[in-house]
Amino acid sequence: MENPLCVSIFLFYCILIQSSAHGQSLGPESFGRRSRAAETNKTPQETRTKFLLFRGETDKGCQILLNHSDTLQQCGFNSSLPLVMIVHGWLVDDILEDWVWEMVAALKSQLAQSVNVGLAEWVTLAHNHYTTAVRNTRLVGQEIAALLQWLQESVQFSPSHVHLIGYSLGAHVSGFAGSYMSRKHKIGRITGLDAAGPLFEKASLSDRLSPDDANFVDAIHTFTWEHMGLSVGMKQPIAHYDFYPNGGSYQPGCHFLELYKHFAKHGLNAITRTVKCAHERSVHLFIDSLLHADMQSMAYLCRDMDRFSQGLCLSCKKGRCNTLGYHTRQERQSKKSKSLFLVTRAQSPFKVYHYQFKIRFINQTENPVEPTFTVSFLGTRGERQKIPITLSKGITSNETYSFLITLDVDIGELIMIKFKWENRMVWSNVWNTVQTIIPWGRGSLHSGLALKSIRVKVGETQQRMTFCSENMNDLLLHPAREKTFVRCEANSETLKRKIR
């Protein structure tokens, strides 16, 4: 995102938001605080929010009217099943975005027999200047709370059986709805999908989605890149579990370089599509968790993406990992939010497999070595060739280097690793020439860089393995040459037989 083009486009997006305010103050204090005691006792007879229920084969929602019990029966509401309700966000146009119907379809196809699928449609309130839509979030939250309170009173439906899924501004709407419920009757779960950042970042707990708004709150952050104090999505933790796919700042396949492709297809709408790509990725990650229940993306507790990229955070001990999306394990082990990181693919299915590599190099030279390596894997179910390895610094001494490698397919249990020094041929020729001049001693040419073993930890299975050089009499690495490492454990022969 350091590209000047990226900065310019993002600034343009921010200017659109700011200009829509017509001079209004851009700060959370300008929207007032929640008045829970004053507002929760008000039960509106009519709402500006439409509550739709989706049952059967039809895609057209059936509207439930507050205080009209007959509509519950007409729409097929089943009080013995949980309610999963979608809450959309700010709208540039006065129609619902396509992702809403995609999520409805995914929920119906995967969970139709076990949940009520609903939608809180607040188009007339969301299709406004951004700051006006922000002001309306409290009203919509109150109306959702009124619906849930009415369901509790009329058909004894407990709010603890409710799961609100809010995208962008809808995440904060869901939070407000939860705050208007009494402590004894809290909403069961709220999922925030890239909760809107402008006017909410760094706001108090009462002015945004927070862990207090439901028995369990999870959030997925996908577009938190910040410039001039603004970001489309919120960066700060706002839930019991906060997931940061690819670090949360941007998403694969959503680079601003894609803008040129979008311009050719969508014209000026390309800017909106490019920005929305990362913001809306949170939605598609959630939908993916429904459609590919057998390929759940695992995330890991970590301090930041830099440490995660070094492979230092692939532990599942004491609740340090969790699945992303609908099937997230609902735990509240402490009041402190847990930030979890993971890598994803650029398209569905988004799941990748995380591997921590620890390699101890022995540098026999006095000068730092900055080689480029590739690694190839052979597993019981497949193989992957020439995956590049990036070291954070040059190899200066006898030091252990840790880094993360991800695969987009399951190759099964690792059997063999091929490690290659991918220096260009010119460098290889120079290196060999130097070695013919410098007397390293008898035997084969020496590179001054040795590698004895590779330690691997698989995030998804928590399995640990050690790989040793196939030829323990030759541990030296050479430019443009490949070295094979095999499992050191006693069961390595059994593993080899699995692929025959």
UniProtKB/Swiss-Prot annotation:
Gene Ontology CC terms? extracellular space; high-density lipoprotein particle
UniProt main location, coarse: secreted
* Coiled-coil residue spans: none
User: Gene3D superfamilies, from UniProt?
Assistant: alpha/beta hydrolase, PLAT/LH2 domain
Q: Which Pfam families match?
A: Lipase, PLAT
Per the UniProt entry, the disulfide pairs are none
Q: Which reaction does it catalyse?
A: a triacylglycerol + H2O = a diacylglycerol + a fatty acid + H(+); a 1-acyl-sn-glycero-3-phosphocholine + H2O = sn-glycerol 3-phosphocholine + a fatty acid + H(+); a 1,2-diacyl-sn-glycero-3-phosphocholine + H2O = a 2-acyl-sn-glycero-3-phosphocholine + a fatty acid + H(+); 1,2,3-tri-(9Z-octadecenoyl)-glycerol + H2O = di-(9Z)-octadecenoylglycerol + (9Z)-octadecenoate + H(+)
User: Which GO MF term does the entry hold, naming one?
Assistant: heparin binding
Spell out the residue ranges making up region: Disordered.
23-44
Look up the signal peptide feature and give its range. Answer: 1-21
Q: Tell me which EC number(s) this protein carries.
A: 3.1.1.3, 3.1.1.5, 3.1.1.32
Region annotated Essential for determining substrate specificity, chain positions: 254-277
Provide this UniProt record's keywords sorted from A to Z: Glycoprotein, HDL, Heparin-binding, Hydrolase, Lipid degradation, Lipid metabolism, Secreted, Signal
Q: Which residues form the active site?
A: S168 (nucleophile), D194 (charge relay system), H279 (charge relay system)
Q: Which residues form the PLAT domain?
A: 353-487
Domain of life, per UniProt, equals Eukaryota
UniProt-listed CDD domains: Pancreat_lipase_like (cd00707), PLAT_LPL (cd01758)
**Residue spans crossing the bilayer:** none
Known glycosylation sites: N67, N78, N363, N398
Q: Where in the cell is it found?
A: Secreted
Q: What interactions and quaternary structure are annotated?
A: Homodimer.
What does this gene product do? Answer: Catalyzes the hydrolysis of triglycerides and phospholipids present in circulating plasma lipoproteins, including chylomicrons, intermediate density lipoproteins (IDL), low density lipoproteins (LDL) of large size and high density lipoproteins (HDL), releasing free fatty acids (FFA) and smaller lipoprotein particles. Also exhibits lysophospholipase activity. Can hydrolyze both neutral lipid and phospholipid substrates but shows a greater binding affinity for neutral lipid substrates than phospholipid substrates.
This chain's protein is named: Hepatic triacylglycerol lipase
Instruction: State the organism named in the record.
Output: Bos taurus (Bovine)
